[in-house]
């Protein structure tokens, strides 16, 4: 037991240790001119620039804008896609017709639609949410439908023989069977939603971390570019960690409901 508890702690120490070592080497390399400080800047200069932008009020507004569009697109895409995937159980012929189209839609380069969406819906918040939604909705539907197909046919037959209605079978067998697939798909979807939101900001936007990176690049402000990349990386890690935590809570609740 002690070895099992020490192992995650040791792994975390190594992770943070390697990150700190990388930052120290980066700072030393920039100061000693081993690397060009104009192109690569340095951790301390990036931190100073970030503080200035935060105090000016622009950085936190860009973080809030990108975070909100990502989360809204993620939630809408996951919920609507999961509901669609679950409802396919009520009509197998419809599901069989829709499945190849879902595969085709999932394979389409949806990020290529970003310029079209910006033209249709403008450079504001809505186009970013829609792009994040499109990135996630098909994946969520396919995850839910694959979970539906894992339901035990013998249990379904038994419930029918005992007089269970279709809605009872759906809520007590189909939905619980699909939940693990739906929950597992959350990790993939949060990354896709973030990618959709950022690409939308790259194309055209009045706010957001993506817009900040593009603006900094066009003005050759590479310190600000690194600020945007760093903050975006931190935001991505925080969102992913939150989804992993949510996944654990939902799985624990689901297992508890099944055992009851």
Residue map of PLM features:
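Periplasmic/extracellular loop-to-transmembrane helix junction in inner-membrane transport proteins
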Residues: 2-8, 32-75
């Amino acid at each position: 037991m002690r070895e099992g508890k020490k192992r995650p702690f040791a792994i975390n120490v190594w992770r943070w240790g390697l990150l700190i070592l990388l930052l120290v080497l980066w700072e030393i390399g920039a100061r000693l001119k081993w690397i060009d400080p104009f192109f690569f800047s340095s951790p301390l200069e990036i931190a100073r620039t970030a503080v200035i932008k935060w105090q000016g009020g622009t950085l936190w507004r860009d973080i809030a804008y990108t975070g909100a569009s990502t989360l809204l697109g993620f939630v809408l895409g996951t919920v609507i896609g999961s509901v669609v995937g679950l409802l396919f159980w009520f009509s197998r012929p419809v599901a069989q017709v829709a499945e190849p189209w879902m595969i085709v839609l999932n394979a389409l380069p949806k990020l290529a639609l970003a310029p079209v969406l910006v033209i249709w819906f403008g450079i504001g918040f809505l186009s970013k949410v829609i792009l994040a939604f499109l990135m996630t909705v098909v994946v969520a539907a396919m995850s839910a439908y694959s979970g539906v197909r894992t339901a035990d046919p013998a249990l379904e037959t038994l419930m029918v023989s005992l007089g269970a209605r279709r809605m009872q079978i759906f809520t007590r067998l189909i939905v619980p069977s699909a939940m693990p697939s739906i929950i597992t798909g959350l990790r993939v979807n949060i990354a896709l939603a973030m990618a959709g939101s950022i690409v939308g900001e790259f194309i055209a936007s009045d706010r957001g971390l993506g817009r900040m990176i593009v603006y900094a690049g066009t003005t050759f402000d590479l310190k600000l570019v690194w600020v945007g990349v760093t903050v975006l990386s931190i935001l991505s890690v925080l969102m992913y960690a939150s989804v992993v935590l949510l996944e654990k809570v939902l799985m624990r609740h689901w297992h508890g409901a099944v055992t009851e």
